[in-house]
């Protein structure tokens, strides 16, 4: 307890919180042993019912009561060597955190929790003893949690008296006051009696004390972690700035909250602030400013709250140390009581906390639920959604061991699994202390500084750090556990970490402490992702809905729970979102890594690569390249942020290149088909080698395979399924043309078969990637959902997939070459003309598509059959036919011009017709070809609909009609031996139109005007009208789609900020 010793006075003042921030010792709940144990966090923190502890406990077991006196607390130096009685007393309060002012109450609850006869032991031991198996975890969480479960009231008081000032609720307010007084005395061991009186009078002081304590604790923990207060201070300052921004936005609402909370805490806060300010100064945290700013509002001053979780948590740290547990269980619940400081809050706190600890839905208190509930409710809702989506969160989770804790995570009972679910081991203690650390950004930062994976991501400055620490922690864990934990932790970050492992918990607690409710909601979503990894397709769509519902609910609940730190949440959400995006990136990468371990890891973001990465992990770097594509994912905000972090993440995740590249980058890559294709091309080259080594061995057998691979690569690229894409990229990009024609049918079939084996997976993965995107509210949601329903078979069916996984992937390519390569091969060379319509257009090319379709049909019959429908594939066939026809006309006319000595007038007509046809094919046909490709690419953004294609086709028909008229005229001349038989007037008319037709689209209009009497003209007029109507409709749809995409893109960043 060097820290405790270093900060004895502070520790005394702040009793259990600071003492063992470093330790797993649960100074918060049982914190005494922590000091006793010399920072032995594990058991000491739990403060097993040793005689001394019992004596102290007995001595202070009633400490929650008003009987606590400053002297009394001070005599108990035993809690923490530095704290002396201070820590113990607060812990006694914690012990009596049950909120039972009477010793008996505390004792009984503690006995209940502790399962020990001695209530005083329970006080210290109760947290530890209440969950003996939870000793490490139990101590802080167990104490609160156990007490919470054992004695909701006790929990309230426990929170109140111990580190959970915010958990102190009116119901136990008296006790809490006493407790606070005791606490204050304890904290105020170095505080004058008058301050003690004020503390006693004002519960807020406790919070401030705890708050300060938390900062101090963070500092101490930081120091223990060899982190300088200055560094922590810097981190805190950074976080404060971030939070200040959100706070400025949320300040008003927070002010109200603070008003409520600060009223009761104003004096305490000032006093605590005074005493804590030095400590805060000691930790150099922005909190002192907050406290100064909001003397009374300090607890919940918007600035305090928003400036730092540490403020939010720091005041809470005592409460946070417990509240870390409780907030972990009910981060918001604690807050809400603080906002209310009323009996109802206290009651609700106890009830909710107990329920949360017990894994209840946190239904007890609306506010409690609102705070904890916006996470909790969203979590439970998410779980319900997951269940509905047959995610079977419990089942999908990789490990049964994880499942129990995961459920709590889902239920936002992370505290439960943290406190109750893992009452075993010093990790509980560690986690609580860590959580305390994580409780404040300083702590989180400090943890980051210390290289704690939990805290690293917490601090925005160290957000980048988190991935590595997280990876470290994940890597440190067993691979299976690691994949689950890393994934779960990544997905559910805190909750999963908690549920996964106390160890993991300590990682997640930071997140939890930062914005536990938010983190839980996000974690729940992440867990949904984890679960979705379990059932990829199924989860993705449902995960998307869950994400929407959870995020929306979380947001709404967060707003409802704004009495808690709604502002904090908002700020925390934006900041945490960014952080989570940062660590989530890592987590996603890790989950993606985990997916490598578990193919079913379909984490929305990482899902895409789960199959591919297995096959071709190497492409990760290319994925990293493509990751910039679009950061729109199911966890849109997180993934978007992740996209921002993906480079670093990918680098960090390079150890896990298989998963990270495939999973994390895919969705974003898929989102931006153009970028994805460009990146895909780039990564195709990069991945070519890795993919070639992997898939080349199997697919580089022939060009056809290469072509299919290339197509798949493009498709995968587009869909950001780099693995298989990588396989194909090496071969695909260039052999595409020649291979296309030659190997279209044979190669296509083989490639298709291979592709189906691999390509379908790619598509599935792509779907999953899209799901991520769709989760982030992308237009791909429909396609994703469709694909989701049908992992491989239907996946192709899904529009792009229908046209073959390659089509789906192909549509993404934004580069003509890619399209030509992909589409030509995949499109059966039908649109080879893309690159060179005339050269590409070839019956040989066209037939291959059929064989290719057939193979596709084998894997994705509906997908291959889909071309029969009026979709991109169908229109591509039409376009191909039209192109071939037009090319034939051009060749014929050119041949006629060469073979015959034609007049300049006729030659002009031929040149006009041929030029118009070539221009039409090279421009409008090409455009339409790309539209068809995009239509077939479910990941295309925006993705043209079949109606759009139909409208554009109608438009093309006008141009085609004009060109056809020219060739008809030439044909008539040819039949007439190239003699112009028409009357001068007619000739005039005909002469005029040819020049006009040179203007491809415009020529038709003049012709129409000139030949308004001709039947073709009337038909053209009608066609033009239809075209204009279709064009307007298509334009509207396209604009709407674009707007949707924009709004989505905008929305996602917003979600990133808000969620």
UniProtKB/Swiss-Prot annotation:
It is found in: Cell membrane; Postsynaptic density; Synapse. The keyword Phosphoprotein applies. GO terms for molecular function: guanylate kinase activity; molecular adaptor activity; protein domain specific binding. One of its GO terms (biological process) is modulation of chemical synaptic transmission. Keywords: Cell membrane, Membrane, Phosphoprotein, Synapse. May play a role in the molecular organization of synapses and neuronal cell signaling. Could be an adapter protein linking ion channel to the subsynaptic cytoskeleton. May induce enrichment of PSD-95/SAP90 at the plasma membrane. Residues 31-56, 244-311, 446-466, 632-669, 723-756, 985-1024 are annotated as: Disordered. GO terms for cellular component: dendrite; dendritic spine; glutamatergic synapse; neurofilament; postsynaptic density, intracellular component; postsynaptic membrane; postsynaptic specialization. The keyword Endoplasmic reticulum does not apply. The modification Phosphothreonine is found at residue 743. Expressed in various brain areas. This is Disks large-associated protein 2. The lineage of its organism: Eukaryota, Metazoa, Chordata, Craniata, Vertebrata. It is a peripheral membrane protein.
């Amino acid at each position: 307890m060097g820290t405790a010793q270093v900060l004895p006075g502070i520790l005394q003042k702040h009793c259990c919180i600071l003492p063992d921030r470093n330790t797993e010792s649960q100074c918060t709940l049982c914190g005494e042993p922590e000091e006793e144990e010399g920072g032995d966090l594990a058991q000491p923190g739990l403060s097993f019912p040793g005689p001394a502890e019992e004596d102290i406990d007995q001595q202070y077991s009633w400490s929650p009561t008003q009987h606590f006196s400053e002297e009394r607390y001070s005599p108990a130096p035993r809690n923490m060597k530095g704290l002396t009685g201070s820590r113990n007393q607060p812990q006694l309060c914690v012990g009596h955190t049950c909120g039972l002012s009477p010793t008996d109450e505390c004792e009984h609850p503690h006995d209940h929790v502790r399962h020990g006869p001695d209530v005083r032991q329970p006080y210290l031991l109760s947290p530890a003893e209440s969950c003996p198996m939870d000793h490490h975890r139990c101590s802080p969480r167990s104490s609160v949690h156990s007490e919470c479960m054992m004695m909701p009231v006790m929990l309230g008081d426990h929170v109140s008296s111990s580190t959970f000032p915010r958990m102190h609720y009116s119901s136990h307010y008296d006790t809490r006051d006493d407790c606070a007084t005791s606490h204050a005395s304890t904290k105020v061991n170095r505080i004058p009696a008058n301050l003690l009186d004020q503390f006693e009078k004002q519960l807020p002081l406790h919070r401030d004390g705890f708050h300060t304590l938390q900062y101090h604790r963070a500092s101490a923990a930081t120091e223990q972690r060899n982190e300088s207060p200055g560094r922590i201070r810097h981190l805190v300052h950074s976080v404060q700035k971030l939070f200040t921004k959100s706070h400025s936005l949320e300040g008003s609402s927070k002010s109200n909250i603070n008003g409520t909370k600060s009223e009761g805490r104003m004096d305490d806060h000032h006093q605590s602030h005074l005493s804590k300010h030095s400590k805060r100064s000691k930790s150099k945290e922005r909190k002192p400013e907050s406290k100064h700013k909001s003397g009374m509002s300090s607890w919940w001053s918007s600035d305090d709250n928003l400036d730092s979780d540490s403020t939010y948590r720091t005041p809470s740290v005592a409460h946070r140390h417990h509240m870390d547990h409780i907030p972990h269980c009910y981060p918001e619940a604690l807050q809400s009581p603080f906002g209310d400081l009323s009996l109802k809050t206290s009651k609700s706190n106890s009830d909710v906390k107990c329920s949360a600890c017990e894994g209840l839905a946190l239904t007890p208190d609306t506010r409690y639920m609102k705070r904890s509930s916006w996470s909790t409710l969203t979590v439970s809702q998410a779980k319900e959604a997951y269940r509905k989506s047959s995610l079977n969160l419990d089942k999908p989770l990789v490990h049964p061991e994880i499942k129990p804790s995961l459920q709590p995570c889902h239920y936002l009972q992370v505290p439960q699994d943290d406190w109750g679910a893992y009452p075993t081991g010093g990790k509980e203690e560690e986690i609580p202390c860590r959580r305390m650390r994580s409780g404040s950004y300083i702590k989180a930062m400090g943890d980051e500084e210390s290289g704690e994976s939990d805290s690293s991501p917490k601090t925005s400055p160290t957000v980048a750090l988190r991935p590595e620490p997280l990876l470290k922690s994940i890597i440190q864990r067993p691979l299976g556990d690691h994949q689950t934990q890393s994934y779960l932790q990544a997905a559910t970050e805190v909750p999963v970490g908690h549920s996964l492992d106390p160890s993991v918990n300590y990682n997640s607690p930071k997140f939890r402490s930062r914005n536990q409710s938010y983190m839980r909601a996000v974690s729940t979503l992440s867990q949904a992702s984890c679960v979705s990894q379990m059932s990829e397709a199924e989860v993705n769509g449902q995960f998307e809905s869950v994400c929407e519902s959870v995020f929306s609910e979380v947001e709404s609940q967060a707003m409802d729970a704004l009495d808690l730190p709604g502002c904090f949440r908002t700020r925390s959400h934006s900041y945490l979102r960014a952080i989570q995006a940062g660590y989530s990136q890592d987590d996603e990468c890790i989950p993606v890594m985990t997916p490598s371990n578990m193919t079913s890891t379909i984490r929305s973001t990482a899902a895409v690569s789960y199959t591919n990465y297995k096959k071709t992990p190497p492409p990760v770097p290319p994925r990293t390249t493509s990751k910039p594509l679009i950061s729109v994912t199911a966890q849109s905000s997180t993934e978007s942020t992740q996209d921002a972090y993906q480079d670093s993440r990918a680098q960090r995740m390079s150890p896990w290149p298989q998963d990270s590249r495939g999973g994390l980058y895919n969705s974003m890559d898929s989102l931006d088909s153009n970028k994805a294709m460009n990146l895909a091309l780039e990564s195709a080259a990069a991945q070519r080698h890795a993919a070639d080594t992997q898939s080349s061995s199997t697919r580089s057998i022939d060009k056809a395979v290469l072509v299919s691979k290339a197509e798949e690569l493009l498709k995968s690229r587009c869909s950001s399924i780099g693995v298989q894409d990588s396989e194909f990229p090496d071969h695909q990009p260039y052999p595409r043309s020649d291979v296309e024609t030659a190997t279209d049918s044979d190669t296509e079939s083989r490639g298709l078969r291979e592709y189906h084996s691999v390509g379908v997976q790619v598509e599935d993965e792509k779907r999953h990637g899209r799901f991520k995107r769709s989760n982030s509210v992308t237009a791909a949601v429909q396609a994703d959902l469709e694909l989701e329903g049908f992992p491989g078979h239907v996946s192709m069916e899904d529009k792009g997939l229908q046209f073959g996984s390659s089509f789906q992937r192909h549509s993404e390519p934004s580069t003509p070459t890619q399209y030509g390569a992909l589409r030509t091969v995949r499109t059966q060379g039908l649109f080879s003309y893309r690159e060179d319509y005339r050269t590409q257009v070839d019956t040989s090319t066209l037939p291959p598509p059929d064989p290719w379709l057939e193979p596709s049909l084998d894997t994705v019959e509906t997908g291959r059959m889909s071309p029969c429908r009026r979709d991109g594939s169908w229109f591509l066939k039409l376009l191909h036919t039209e192109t071939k026809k037009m090319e034939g006309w051009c060749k014929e006319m050119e041949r006629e011009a060469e073979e015959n000595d034609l007049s300049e007038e006729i030659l002009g007509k031929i040149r006009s017709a041929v030029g118009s046809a070539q221009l039409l094919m090279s421009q409008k046909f090409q455009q339409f070809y790309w539209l068809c490709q995009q239509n077939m690419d479910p990941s295309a953004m925006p993705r043209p609909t079949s109606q759009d294609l139909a409208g554009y086709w109608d438009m093309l028909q006008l141009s085609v009609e004009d060109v056809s008229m020219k060739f008809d005229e030439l044909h008539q001349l040819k039949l007439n031996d190239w003699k112009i038989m028409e009357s001068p007037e007619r000739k005039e008319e005909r002469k005029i139109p040819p020049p006009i037709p040179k203007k491809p689209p415009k020529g038709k209009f003049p012709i129409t005007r000139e030949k308004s009497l001709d039947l073709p003209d009337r038909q053209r007029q009608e066609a033009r009208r239809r075209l204009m109507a279709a064009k307007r409709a298509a334009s509207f749809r396209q604009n709407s789609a674009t707007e949707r995409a924009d709004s989505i893109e905008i929305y996602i960043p917003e979600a990133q900020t808000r969620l």
